[in-house]
């Protein structure tokens, strides 16, 4: 398994797609910060060029990395069945479970690289270009990131699992959007009327990372409290576990 993990590390970290994705994420963040700075220079009394506004705005968009987790999952397994690379791995005697788990491990490492670069650029750029609102908003952003990481990993593993279930890049993406985004969104809407749906939605990944409640002070997120933070972690770990089980089941039944 170690050798296969090394080969996957080499493959993913020597492909342009990872660096294009990371660069695009960093560029979007810097353009956002740069736009706020430009507005503060050319607009009188522009009050949004602060780290409070910038960091809180991006903390309110934690569902965007969930979509990006599907992109990362696709990078890890894209066209593997089409070009028979999965067949070659199995033919060399690598157990199917190890193939899947190795891709999960390397996908987590690649995701960590992308996240580290992007968040470092965000925080550094925020302090360089914008008015410093204090450490509280930086810590809140970091706390939100930590709370959502398990959910993002679950999103990546879900795409990888669905690829082996469907055998198609396009089909796996559509099914991912259905079960990760569409169905939980509908459940969340029904939760406005039915208590059971509200309780169920509170454990689903997409509503959990996208829920934002305006307050008198500023914004409140699911992870703002200790109990909410723990619940986000638990939901993410449950999602990871379920989709790993699904992925192993699917890869075992996949014909060569």
Predicted regions: what they are:
Residues 1-26:
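Aromatic- and glycine-rich beta-strand/loop motifs that create alpha-glucan
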């Amino acid at each position: 398994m170690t050798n296969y993990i090394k080969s996957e590390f080499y493959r993913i970290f020597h492909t342009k797609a990872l660096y294009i994705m990371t660069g695009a994420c960093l560029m979007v963040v810097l353009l956002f910060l740069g736009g706020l700075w430009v507005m503060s220079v050319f607009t009188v009394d522009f009050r949004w060029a602060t780290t409070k506004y910038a960091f809180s705005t991006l903390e309110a968009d934690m569902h965007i990395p969930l979509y990006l987790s599907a992109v990362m999952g696709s990078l890890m397994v894209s066209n593997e069945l089409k070009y028979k690379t999965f067949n070659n791995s199995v033919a060399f005697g690598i157990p199917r479970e190890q193939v899947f788990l190795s891709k999960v491990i390397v996908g987590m490492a690649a995701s960590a690289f992308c996240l580290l670069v992007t968040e470092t650029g965000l925080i550094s750029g925020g302090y360089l270009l914008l008015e410093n609102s204090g450490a509280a908003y930086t810590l809140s952003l970091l706390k939100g990131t930590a709370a959502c990481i398990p959910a993002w990993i679950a999103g990546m593993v879900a795409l990888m699992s669905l690829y082996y279930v469907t055998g198609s890049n396009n089909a796996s993406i559509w099914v991912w959007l259905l079960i990760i985004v569409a169905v939980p969104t509908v459940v969340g809407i029904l939760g406005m009327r039915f208590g059971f749906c509200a309780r169920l939605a509170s454990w689903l990944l997409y509503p959990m990372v996208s829920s934002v409640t305006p307050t008198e002070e500023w914004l409140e997120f699911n992870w703002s409290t200790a109990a909410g933070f723990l619940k986000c972690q638990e939901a993410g770990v449950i999602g990871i576990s379920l989709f790993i089980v699904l992925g192993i089941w699917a890869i075992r039944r996949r014909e060569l």
